């Protein structure tokens, strides 16, 4: 690969002085609300994306104004656990210093601030730091926020899995002091080293999870590296290691495709960090730094072969993978309402549509959560399905917390199973990559699907339905039973045939069709499912069995097959 010209991102990282660039100078430049040159990309490795409000972009251009530049920040919260004190801190910042006033829970099991203007950026990082939160490496060519199954019931096993998620996150973090120097006025302490990530970091983004079967809420096949918890007598003994999943693709480029992760085998829990490091450094050294569209771990595995990659990981750790231990996934959705943990503590899972926490007319969700945070003695847990768990509630506080939640629209008994199993990425107006609506499209379209479900006698059932505004895959549509991927305004590619467990990639059924056309297709398909399904057969399994689409078995070979 060395004879070929490296992608420009490789130059940018190499010249960045360990991610510093000239960000500090840019912060002082008040001629533009944005970041210039390389800094536009470099801020991603500090957890931010430069965006603008696309709803008013044309209007501002007419007024000879630049786009309304702002940043989106994604916090680093391994396992998604946040204390009530931290919650009140981010609630206040979102209200006082963001354009939209909201907290957005994301599929990366963390929160995002949208619409932070340049004069507030440094203060934002300092505010987060005051509450023990940072945004290091939540974007860019690094290991991103580490996910962990939200399972408050099995409290002991979950706690240990969560501790490993935190340890993995810390171990794989960039070691540069650039973040502390720029945002927290940290001391400049001499030369930096990056023993794991290297001076040019990874070829592309890298996503890691810790998952506790039978619950696949974090969608293992969407991630580069997964540690599947294996327990004996309720105690964690180790992990099966799954490598090379990922959902992003590029419209029109058949060299890009979603891919499921491969099971490399079982490891003892004490070897977890060694294996995490070995997988990351193998991808660091073997990944494609010429073509970013083929730079992720999934493409490295396709190019060099699973066996060669696995052997290199074993060589770097000095430990052989053991044979995989058996496990099964049975579900992905969150368990809404109250559940009791084995420790007797109560846990309340709240459905937050699209993860958008804001005071809506008649549903002051943001105020309600702040009121709960003021009295709650446990913690909050963000889920990878964009919902929120009020965890560790003592029995005596249960009624009080439920009363606040109901008064603020945080509990709604009328929400259907279909709505609970529908999800979208942010898309317009803030995401610069969005080709179509997703978050703003989902609620009303889900209402239309609910009507179709009721018409066919399926009102109590559900289909895993997901929408992404572009093919990058943040909403994980490529693991849905019905997935829509944006192509243009009100036009989507329409995929069917994933399964409820999240272990099969769907296939394209129709290309570039409108939402009205999609609804007609869904009506016909759900009608057949209602009449012809086997007992308890999910929609995705039905469309495969009925021959409506062929299953995607090996996506590198058959994802684009007719």
From Swiss-Prot:
Enzyme Commission numbers on file: 1.8.1.2
SS bonds (residue pairs): none
GO cellular component annotations of the record: sulfite reductase complex (NADPH)
Domain of life: Bacteria
Enzyme's top EC category: oxidoreductase
Co-factor binding comment: Binds 1 siroheme per subunit. Binds 1 [4Fe-4S] cluster per subunit.
Reaction equation(s) it catalyzes: hydrogen sulfide + 3 NADP(+) + 3 H2O = sulfite + 3 NADPH + 4 H(+)
Signal peptide bounds: none
Binding site for [4Fe-4S] cluster: 425, 431, 470, 474
Subunit text: Alpha(8)-beta(8). The alpha component is a flavoprotein, the beta component is a hemoprotein.
Protein name per UniProt: Sulfite reductase [NADPH] hemoprotein beta-component
């Amino acid at each position: 690969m060395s004879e070929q010209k490296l992608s420009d991102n490789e130059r940018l990282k190499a010249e960045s002085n360990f991610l510093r660039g000239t960000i500090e100078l840019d912060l002082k430049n008040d001629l533009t609300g944005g970041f210039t040159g390389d800094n536009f990309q470099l801020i991603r490795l500090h957890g931010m994306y430069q965006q603008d409000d696309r709803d008013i972009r044309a209007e501002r251009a007419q007024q000879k104004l630049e786009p309304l530049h702002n940043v989106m920040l994604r916090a680093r919260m391994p396992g998604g656990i946040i204390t009530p004190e931290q919650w009140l801190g981010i609630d206040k910042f979102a209200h006082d210093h963001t354009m939209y006033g909201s907290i957005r829970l994301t599929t990366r099991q963390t929160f995002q601030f949208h619409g932070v203007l340049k004069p507030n950026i440094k203060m934002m990082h300092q505010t987060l730091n005051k509450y023990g939160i940072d945004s290091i490496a939540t974007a860019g060519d690094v290991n991103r926020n580490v996910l962990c199954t939200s399972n408050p019931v099995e409290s002991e096993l979950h706690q240990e899995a969560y501790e490993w998620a935190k340890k993995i996150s810390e171990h794989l973090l960039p070691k540069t002091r650039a973040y502390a120097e720029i945002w927290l006025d940290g001391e400049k302490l001499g030369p930096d080293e990056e023993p794991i990530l290297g001076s040019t970091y990874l070829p592309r983004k890298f996503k890691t999870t810790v998952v506790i079967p039978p619950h696949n809420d974090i969608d293992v096949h969407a991630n580069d590296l997964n540690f599947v918890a294996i327990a004996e007598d309720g105690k964690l003994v180790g992990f099966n290691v799954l490598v090379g999943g990922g959902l992003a693709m590029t419209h029109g480029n058949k060299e890009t495709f979603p891919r499921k992760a491969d099971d490399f085998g079982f490891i003892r829990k004490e070897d977890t960090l060694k294996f995490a490091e070995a997988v990351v450094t193998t991808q660091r050294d073997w990944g494609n730094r010429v073509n970013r569209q083929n730079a992720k771990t999934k493409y490295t595995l396709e190019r060099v072969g699973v066996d060669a990659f696995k052997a290199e990981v074993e060589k770097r750790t000095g430990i052989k993978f053991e044979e995989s231990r058996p496990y099964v996934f049975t579900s992905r959705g969150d368990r809404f309402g109250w559940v009791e943990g084995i420790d007797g503590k109560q846990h309340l899972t709240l459905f937050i549509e699209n993860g958008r926490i804001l005071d809506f007319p008649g549903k002051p969700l943001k105020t309600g959560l702040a009121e709960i945070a003021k009295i709650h003695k446990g913690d909050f847990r963000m889920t990878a399905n964009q919902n929120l768990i009020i965890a560790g509630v003592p029995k005596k506080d249960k009624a009080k917390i439920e009363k606040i939640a109901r008064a603020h629209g945080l509990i709604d008994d009328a929400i259907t199973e279909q709505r609970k199993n529908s999800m979208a990425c942010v898309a317009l107006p803030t995401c610069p990559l969005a080709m179509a609506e997703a978050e703003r499209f989902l609620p009303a379209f889900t209402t239309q699907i609910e009507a179709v479900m009721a018409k066919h006698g399926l009102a109590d059932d559900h289909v895993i339905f997901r929408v992404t505004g572009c093919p990058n895959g943040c909403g994980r549509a490529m693991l849905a039973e019905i997935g829509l991927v944006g192509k243009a305004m009100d036009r989507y590619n329409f995929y069917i045939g994933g399964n409820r467990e999240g272990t099969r990639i769907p296939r394209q059924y129709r290309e570039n069709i409108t939402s009205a056309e999609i609804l007609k297709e869904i009506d016909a398909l759900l009608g057949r499912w209602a009449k012809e399904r086997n007992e308890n057969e999910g929609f995705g399994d039905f469309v495969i069995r009925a021959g409506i689409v062929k299953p995607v078995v090996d996506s590198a070979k058959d994802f684009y097959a007719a």
